[in-house]
Swiss-Prot record:
Residue numbers bearing the N-acetylcysteine modification: C22
Leader sequence residues: 1-21
Main location: membrane
Entry similarity comment: Belongs to the BMP lipoprotein family.
Taxonomic path: Archaea, Methanobacteriati, Methanobacteriota, Thermococci, Thermococcales
Stated name of the protein: Uncharacterized lipoprotein PF1695
Gene3D superfamilies: 3.40.50.2300
An annotated GO cellular component: plasma membrane
Top-level taxon in the UniProt lineage: Archaea
Source organism: Pyrococcus furiosus (strain ATCC 43587 / DSM 3638 / JCM 8422 / Vc1)
Alphabetized PROSITE patterns for the sequence: PROKAR_LIPOPROTEIN (PS51257)
UniProt keywords, alphabetically: Acetylation, Cell membrane, Lipoprotein, Membrane, Signal
Lipidated sites in chain (S-archaeol cysteine): C22
Bilayer topology term: Lipid-anchor
One of the Pfam families matching this protein, by short name: Bmp
């Protein structure tokens, strides 16, 4: 994979709480590492999380010379049997598990196969094992920036309401919710302009029709900007925004997430949040290839380049991927970049970018550190306080 542009500096990784010992011996020189990447039940084609994982693994194939196989369970009930089957085969040096839904299956299986290496992306079992690496993201940090941007866009569209179409009610989405609302309230504090947030869980990452219906409902409730946080489901949300505009019901815009999704409809999707699942997958594979495997937990945030928002280089890169895959219709990658640039200039004003840069710097230098809720009750309490304008409720205490 060619280098992808992101608004952040060079990607670095912060490794936290790692176990000192390595497992599984050393890789024999010349022996090809074999990896299985296990998507969640949504599989490829979500234009987001799973597709980003695929790009990271493909980069590893190209740059590290590994062999990669891709698998998607038919249902959640298939996850444990699939893990056991692959571990018992002793065929794979590493099993990379994509997404929160793999958490419980991995926890049930990992101790039974101590010589099998596992990498869990975007979740943690809460256990520190020598054969398990968990890679997490500080989603609040990117979502806070998106919250500022969405709020500014809403006002340019003549409204004060932003929305989000989310997938399942799970910890990674709690963090997105906290960050997005924090950003909206930060914008409110800096500008004096009130912002209302409509947040809706759909319960699915795979149903575009649900995404469409939910998106339409939020637009009918007055949302001017919708943030997609539901994988394939929020592609339906994109379609709702497109139809809303084309049917003359009003002007609205959408924001993508994980991969750069502007190419899908650049006139209506001027920006996407970045969650570098590709970096996480590549890093896990690289640890095996370079005999640097250590069990534990990694976290990636703004400072490490693991989250953020896509710049125009990234927009171009993913438009090229879409073109190569036959998904980019009636335009070129250059057209996508040109339209996105025009839409950003029109709807994201310089004063909004100033607020974004200020908030980004505070996060990167540690002045702002978000809490990670440890329970649903804590998550709900943080949201309630943020809705009151209490920004400190979302932050770690000194």
């Amino acid at each position: 994979m060619r280098k992808v542009g992101i608004t952040l500096s060079v990607v670095a990784l912060v490794i936290m709480g790692f176990v000192a010992g390595c497992i599984g011996g050393t890789q024999t020189q010349g022996e090809k590492v074999k990896v299985a990447v296990l998507f969640d039940v949504g599989g490829r084609g979500d234009l987001s999380f799973n597709d980003m994982a695929y790009l990271g693994a493909e980069r590893a194939k190209k740059e590290l010379g590994v062999e990669v196989e891709y698998m998607t369970p038919k249902s959640r009930e298939d996850m444990v049997p699939l893990l056991k089957q692959l571990a018992e085969s002793k065929e794979y040096d590493l099993l990379v598990l994509i997404g929160f839904l793999w958490t419980t299956p991995l926890d049930q299986v990992a101790d039974q196969y101590p010589d099998q290496k596992f990498a869990l992306i975007d979740s943690t079992t809460g256990k520190v094992r020598e054969n398990e690496v968990d890679i997490l993201f500080r989603e609040q940090e990117a979502a806070a920036l998106i919250g500022v941007i969405a709020s500014g866009m809403a006002y340019e569209l003549g409204g004060d309401t932003i929305g989000a179409v989310a997938g399942m009610d799970i910890p990674p989405l709690w963090k997105f919710h906290i960050g997005y609302l924090y950003g909206a309230k930060y914008f409110e504090k800096k500008t004096g302009k009130p912002v209302k947030l409509l947040w809706q869980y759909t319960g699915t990452f795979t149903d575009t029709q649900v995404g469409y219906t939910t998106g339409m409902q939020l637009l009918q409730q007055g949302a001017k900007v919708l943030y997609g946080l539901a994988g394939l489901t929020h592609v339906g949300m994109f379609d709702a925004v497109i139809d809303w505009n084309k049917q003359g019901k009003g002007k609205a815009l959408a924001i993508g997430q994980d991969a750069s999704q502007e190419w899908y409809a650049p006139e209506y999707i001027p920006i996407s949040g970045a969650k570098r699942v590709d970096v996480a997958v590549y890093t896990a594979i690289e640890m095996v290839v370079k005999n640097q495997w250590k069990g534990g937990i990694m976290t990636l945030g703004l400072k490490e380049g693991g989250v953020g928002y896509w710049n125009l280089d990234g927009v171009r890169q993913f438009a090229e991927f879409a073109q190569e895959g036959g998904k980019l219709k009636d335009m070129t990658p250059e057209d996508v970049v040109r339209i996105v640039k025009e839409q950003r200039e029109k709807y994201i004003k310089p004063e909004v970018w100033e607020i974004v840069r200020e908030l980004e710097e505070k996060i990167k230098n540690g002045e702002i550190k978000f809490k990670t809720p440890q329970s649903h009750d804590e998550y709900e309490q943080i949201i309630k306080e943020l809705e009151k304008g209490n920004l400190d409720a979302a932050l770690e205490k000194e």
